[in-house]
């Protein structure tokens, strides 16, 4: 027997679906809903619309435990609130032979996952249903093509969406769930005023209504019994059933609503109003009051020349220069590890080299956990080689304690404890103390020596017996951060002193009188000293953390001795032909004080500054125009914050493009994402969304579906294998096919319909097992082949 998957606007009007073909979703245009539906089935070996060989699998299932997925996007043709649309399974008749204990156990598990689920055995068509807005695994939205220019979007950063499954509750035969367990589902007609304000309510956060908690507390995470093993990507578009928390966070473009809503009235206010009087906007049930002045300052729209990093959690409209590019990425999650050359936008010169090495996202040091920063070059190379290898038993600290390091017989916790040198707080305190010491060195050599003595005494107290390991980790971490985060800032004038990155590496590096040298303090006798060329008027740059903001030039090593820092010299080799002596930071600081003996002279267009201990030569422009620092170039650090536009693949299903826009998921590397900012005004997890809409009928009735919005959902499960109809959920392991057909043949039918009318159906997806030579299927396949020949 083979699996037949059919899709239609109701049970009487269906067609065979192209299973696992991302570029061929089934188009549905009924009286209540218009949209596209895509079905994926693992190890599919069933019927195709034209009788061609089936596509057995999809990239979607790689690294996941899911057995099937239903993905639907579309628009409602009527006005509904959140309580008037339900989704679930509906049968043709009652299943009399299904074990009662198994049914009760299954319903308890279903209610544990989705608290709003309910069933009715004795209805004309028995069903197991739940409110659509509460039960789907992911929910997102974007504006219809006719309202695209009115959209308000924002770049959102959120935790990784979680795994497929979670630990299941204990099962006993006395457990049962019915309609009586839930609040009444009778729909109260909407008032006239509510019907008028449908558009406003759809984009405003209903959680601010009286007696509704503003931010529901997510339940505590529980260990998963079935691991997801999603090794494909940095992030996953899974359901939100929490397992172990993941380190990484992802960024995506989110749809917040329409600009004509009172919620976004501040976006139409001029950007600069210095002394505007406090004028309050029109208020509604779900909109807070904002003054014009506060809206113009803290919530003003982003300007065209504003840095990309400022886009995070900021609302932008069609006035933004890249709006048309970003609005096409709404609701999409790209899995960059499936294609190492696709990930995030970076600088034009930097990005190509970074992508070749398979690094698509550089983490932010300030948001990164301390233990995640202890990487070495050896670990990085080894991880790149093994990133596609599957491992059954992964060490969660494998990036920190890589087996190839051969660090000894230390246990993982003990080794991590030894490697975690100091906390961020102590590092910041040390940085502040270094700043004070540097300022003291500027005025007195004696005070510099005193500060050095105190610093040496402090290092003795904090030193650890792992100096070689510290240096290995430190140098690897600095090199990794330096290579991917920094570009050299050029000092140029109007006369045209210009230099590229490649030319600078080849040219001689001259020493400026205002050069700053920096010594990174570590609890070890070995120090890493970095120096860089900078404007003499610039202030000293402080290293604030393990991989803080560092200059992009040379790195040298000096050994601490009993000689005061002011008497030590360091040598820099710029080229094989030229060797320039440079002083330490103490002497450079002293040279800038009034007591320093500096004799500036002009020789052939160059400035020569003579001191007692060193001579420094610096190029000087021929013009009298003052040197100015150019505007910083956006490097990989800032550009990596913006998700790269997903590669669009044209779809064969384009008849509904005028109503829905182009199909966005023909690329198998793209998944629908959980994006509910249009509901709550900010990102909430799947569990928080489910908990909120399952908590009361009042919450569902205060959410409205907008006819100008395309809603996208995905529904999946790792428990049901439709190729065999084997159900495996918790203690339940049985084949449901024989029970379904004991009293007459019937398929498993998922549908979205109205709550009060079982005949008011938006769409259906049927799964059925049929014989290979089923006449109905053969006739439908022949009809499809004939249609394709004509077109």
Swiss-Prot record:
A motif (FFAT) lies at residues 373-379. Residues 415-426, 477-487 have a biased composition (Basic residues). Residues 158-189, 381-505, 542-606, 630-658 are annotated as: Disordered. It is found in: Cell membrane. It is a peripheral membrane protein. Pfam families: Duc1 (PF08588), Duc1_FFAT_like (PF24794). Belongs to the UPF0590 family. This is DUF1769 family protein duc1. It comes from Schizosaccharomyces pombe (strain 972 / ATCC 24843).
């Amino acid at each position: 027997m083979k699996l037949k998957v059919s899709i239609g606007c109701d049970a009487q009007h269906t067609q065979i679906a192209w299973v696992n073909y991302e570029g061929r979703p089934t188009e549905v245009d009924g009286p209540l809903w218009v949209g596209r539906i895509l079905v994926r089935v693992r190890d599919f070996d069933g019927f195709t619309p034209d009788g061609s060989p089936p596509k057995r699998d999809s990239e979607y299932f790689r690294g996941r435990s899911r057995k099937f997925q239903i993905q639907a996007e579309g628009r409602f043709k009527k006005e509904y609130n959140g309580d008037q649309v339900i989704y679930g399974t509906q049968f043709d008749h009652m299943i009399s032979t299904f074990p009662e204990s198994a049914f009760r156990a299954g319903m308890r598990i279903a209610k544990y996952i989705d608290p709003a689920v309910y069933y009715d055995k004795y209805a004309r068509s028995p069903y197991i249903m739940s409110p659509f807005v509460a039960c789907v695994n992911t929910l997102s939205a974007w504006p219809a093509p006719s309202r695209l220019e009115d959209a308000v979007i924002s770049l959102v950063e959120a935790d990784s969406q979680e795994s497929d499954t979670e630990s299941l509750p204990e099962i006993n035969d006395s457990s049962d769930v019915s309609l009586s367990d839930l609040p009444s589902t009778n729909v109260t007609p909407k008032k006239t005023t509510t019907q008028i304000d449908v558009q406003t309510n759809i984009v405003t956060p209903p959680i601010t209504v009286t007696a509704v908690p503003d931010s529901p507390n997510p339940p505590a995470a529980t260990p998963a019994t079935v691991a997801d093993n999603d090794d494909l990507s940095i992030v996953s578009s899974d359901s939100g059933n929490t397992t172990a928390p993941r380190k990484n966070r992802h960024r995506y473009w989110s749809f917040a609503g329409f600009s004509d809503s009172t919620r976004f009235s501040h976006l139409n206010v001029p950007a600069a109003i210095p002394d505007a009087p406090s004028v309050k906007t029109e208020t509604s049930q779900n909109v807070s009051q904002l003054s014009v002045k506060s809206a113009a300052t803290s919530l003003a729209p982003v300007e065209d020349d504003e840095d990309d990093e400022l886009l995070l959690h900021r609302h932008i409209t069609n006035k933004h220069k890249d709006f048309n590019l970003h609005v096409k990425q709404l609701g999409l999650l790209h899995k960059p590890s499936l294609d190492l050359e696709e990930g995030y936008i970076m600088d034009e010169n930097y990005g190509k080299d970074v992508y070749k090495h398979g690094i698509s996202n550089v983490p932010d040091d300030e948001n990164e956990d301390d233990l995640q920063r202890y990487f070495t070059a050896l670990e990085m190379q080894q991880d790149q080689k093994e990133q596609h290898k599957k491992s059954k038993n992964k060490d969660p600290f494998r990036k920190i304690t890589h087996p190839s390091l051969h660090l000894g017989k230390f246990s993982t916790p003990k080794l991590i404890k030894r490697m975690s040198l100091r906390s961020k707080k102590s590092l910041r305190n040390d940085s502040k103390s270094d700043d004070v010491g540097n300022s003291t060195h500027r005025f007195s050599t004696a005070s510099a020596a005193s500060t050095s003595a105190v610093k040496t005494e402090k290092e003795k107290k904090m030193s650890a017996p792992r100096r070689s390991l510290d240096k290995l980790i430190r140098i690897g971490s600095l090199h990794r951060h330096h290579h991917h985060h920094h570009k050299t800032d050029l000092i140029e004038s109007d006369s045209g002193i210009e230099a590229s990155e490649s030319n600078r590496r080849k040219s001689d590096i001259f020493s400026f009188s205002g050069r700053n040298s920096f010594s990174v303090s570590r609890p070890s006798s070995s120090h890493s000293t970095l120096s860089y060329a900078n404007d003499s008027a610039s202030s000293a740059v402080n290293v604030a953390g393990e991989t803080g903001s560092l200059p992009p030039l040379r790195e040298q090593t000096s050994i601490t001795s009993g000689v005061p820092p002011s008497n030590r010299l360091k040598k820099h080799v710029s080229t094989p032909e030229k060797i320039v002596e440079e002083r330490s930071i103490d002497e450079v600081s002293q040279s800038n004080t009034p007591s320093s003996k500096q004799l500036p002279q002009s020789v052939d267009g160059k400035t020569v500054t003579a001191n007692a201990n060193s001579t420094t030569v610096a190029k000087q422009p021929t013009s009298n125009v003052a040197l100015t620092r150019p505007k910083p170039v956006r490097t990989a650090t800032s550009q990596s914050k913006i998700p790269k536009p997903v590669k669009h693949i044209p779809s064969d299903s384009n008849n509904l493009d005028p109503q829905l826009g182009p199909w966005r998921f023909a690329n198998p590397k793209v998944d629908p994402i959980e994006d509910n900012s249009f509901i709550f005004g900010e990102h909430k997890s799947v569990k928080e969304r489910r908990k909120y809409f399952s908590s009361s009928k009042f919450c569902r009735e205060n959410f409205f579906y907008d006819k100008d919005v395309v809603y996208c959902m995905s529904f999946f499960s790792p428990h049901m294998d439709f190729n065999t109809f084997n159900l495996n959920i918790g203690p339940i392991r049985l084949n449901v096919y024989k029970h379904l057909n004991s009293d007459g043949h019937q398929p498993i039918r998922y549908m979205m319909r109205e709550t009060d009318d079982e005949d008011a159906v938006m769409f259906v997806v049927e799964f059925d097992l049929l014989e290979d030579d089923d006449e109905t299927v053969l006739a439908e396949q022949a009809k499809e082949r004939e249609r394709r020949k004509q077109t």
